[in-house]
C-alpha cells in the first residue's frame, strides 16, 4: 500500500512544475496577501491567552497523533494505511494551525515592538523637553543670582538716617508726600541731599585750606622769630652751667641713670657703659635702663664697722634662737644655696627694637657669689600674634637665645671655679636654676667684660671694657637677626599648619608654576621622637641631632604617595640651614638607604640649599625647602616608569618638562630646575 500511494503521489509533484500552476500560484499569492492583512486585523480581535491554550492543545494532539501513527506502523498490518492517512491529514491540519499561531505571534511581537519604540520616542522627547526646561531654569537662576548680587555705587555711600533726612533736608529735596511711599524716589532724594551736603562741605574745605595757608604763614613768621631766640637761649644756658654745678641740680634723666650706675657691680657697669655708648654711636633704637632697688644696692657697700656691729647683733640674736631650736642640715643647705645664688639688687635692661617694631627685652643680672652674669629674654610684638602649636618654643624665654654662638646653650656655668662652690652646698648643676636666675651664656659674660680661663680657674675675675666693646656690635646684630628669624618662622608655621607653604614673590622664580604635591601635615616632635624614627639614624649617629635643636615632621602627599620629612632646625637658623631626612611610602617604603633618588632629593634641599636662600637675610629658606620637596616629589612620581601590565591611565601623568628622564646605571632622575626655561635636568 505504501508503494502504491507513493506512485500515486509522484505525478502530483511533477505537475507542480507546469505553467498552469504558476497562474494558480499567483492567485494564491494575492489570496495569501489578503489573508495576511486579514490576520493583522484578526490579531486585535483574538485573545492571546486562548491562542496559547490552542497552541498547547494542538501540540498535545500532534504528540498523540504521532504516537498513534508510530503504534500503527509498528504493528505492520496492511489495513492500517487508511487510519494512518487519516491521522496524517489531521496532523497536517494541526501543523497549519501551528503556522497560523506562529504568524499571529510574530505579528503581536512586531506590534509590541512598534508600540514600545513609539513609547520610547515619546519618553525621549519628554526627557529632552525636561532637560531643556532644567537648563532654562538654571540659566534663570543664575541671572536672578547676578541680579541679586549686583551692587550699585550708591550702596557704598553712607547716607544719613531717614529721621535726620526728613528733619534736616529742605522740602524741595525731601518731598515727603512722594518719597514716603516710594522707596526708589526716597533713595533718589537722599542721594540729592547727600550731594548737596558734599557741595557745602567742599566749600567749607576750600575755606579751611585758605585759613590753613594763612595760619601756616603766621607760624612761619613766629618760627623765624623763635629761631632768632635760640642763640640767645644757648648763651643763657651756657652762662648758667656754673650755677647748676654749684647747686647740684640734675635736669637730665641720663644724669640720674649715671648716678644709679655708680651702684652697679663692675660687670653690669661695664655692660651699661658699653651698651649706652653703642646705642649713641651705632644704634639709636637700643635703649638702656637700670632696674632694681638702689637702697638695697647701697646697703651692700656699708662701712665695715657698721657691718661688724650688725653682724654682732645678728650673732647675738642667732645665739638666742639657737638655744631654742636647732636647724636641720637640709634647712642649712637650702639657706646656703639661696645665699650662693643670690643676685645683685640692681639689673640692666636692654630694649633692642627691630625693623618690624618688635622689641627684644633683655634683663641682665649679676650673681655676686658666683661672679657670673645671667640674662632673661622676652619678645614683644607690635601686633599680637596667634601662636601656632608648632611655634610654641620659638619665642619662649628658655630657648629664644639658645646657641646664639655655636655651642653656647646657657645650661651650665662658664666659671670653672663655681663647680667647687657647688660641691660645698650640694648643687649638682646650674641647669636646675636657670629658669629662676636666667641663662649664663658665654656672650653675656663677654658683654660684661668677664673672661674665665679654663687652665687657671679663678673665683674673682675683673671685667675688661675692651672685651665688652669688641663683642658688643656683633652680639647686637646677632640678637636682631635671631628675633627676626624667629618671628618669620612664627608666621610661616601658622601657614604650614594649615597646609599652605608660603612662597614670597621674590622666590617664585625658584619653582615651576604648577606644583601638584601638597603639604598636609606640619607638627613639632620631641628629640626622643626624632631619634626613634628609623630613617634618621644616620643624622643621630653623625651627632647632628642635639637636644638644643628643634624637630618637626612634615607630610607631603600626592595621590597614593606620601613623603615624610623629618626636619632638624638649628637654633642658628637661617645662617645654619635645616637638615631634612625623607621617607617615601609608595610601592613600598623608600629611604636614602634603598633608593638613590631619595638620596638625591635630600641632597637637593640639604646640600644645594644656597639656591633656595632667596633675598637676605634668607628667612624664607625653610619654606623654600618645603616647596622644593613638593616639586621634587612631583618629578619623582611623574618620571617613574609605568607598568604595562596594568591597564588604564597613569596615576601620575608627566607634566614637568625634562630633558632626560634617567641617567646612569642608578637611573637618577632630573631634579634640578632651570629658570626661566622651565625644564628639569640632571646636576
UniProtKB/Swiss-Prot annotation:
GO CC annotation, single: nucleus
Family the UniProt entry places it in: Belongs to the THOC5 family.
Keywords on record: Acetylation, Coiled coil, Cytoplasm, Differentiation, Isopeptide bond, mRNA processing, mRNA splicing, mRNA transport, Nucleus, Phosphoprotein, RNA-binding, Transport, Ubl conjugation
One family name in Pfam for this protein: FmiP_Thoc5
InterPro entries: THO_Thoc5
Subunit: Component of the THO subcomplex, which is composed of THOC1, THOC2, THOC3, THOC5, THOC6 and THOC7. The THO subcomplex interacts with DDX39B to form the THO-DDX39B complex which multimerizes into a 28-subunit tetrameric assembly. Component of the transcription/export (TREX) complex at least composed of ALYREF/THOC4, DDX39B, SARNP/CIP29, CHTOP and the THO subcomplex; in the complex interacts with THOC1, THOC2, THOC5, THOC6 and THOC7; forms a coiled-coil dimer with THOC7; together with THOC6 and THOC7, plays a key structural role in the oligomerization of the THO-DDX39B complex.
GO terms, molecular function: mRNA binding
Region of interest called Interaction with THOC7, as start-end residue ranges on this chain: 2-199
Induction description: Up-regulated following CSF1 stimulation.
Keyword Coiled coil: yes
Name recorded for this polypeptide: THO complex subunit 5 homolog
Top-level taxonomy: Eukaryota, Metazoa, Chordata, Craniata, Vertebrata
Biased composition (Basic and acidic residues): 22-42
Record carries keyword Acetylation: yes
Name of the gene this protein is made from: Thoc5
Coiled-coil intervals, chain numbering: 81-247
Tissue-by-tissue expression: Ubiquitously expressed, with highest levels in testis, liver and heart.
Species per Swiss-Prot/TrEMBL record: Mus musculus (Mouse)
Main location (coarse class): nucleus
Traits of the deletion mutant: Embryonic lethality seen before day 5.5 of embryonic development (E5.5).
Residues recorded with modification Phosphothreonine: 328
PANTHER family cross-referenced by the UniProt entry: FMS INTERACTING PROTEIN, THO COMPLEX SUBUNIT 5 HOMOLOG
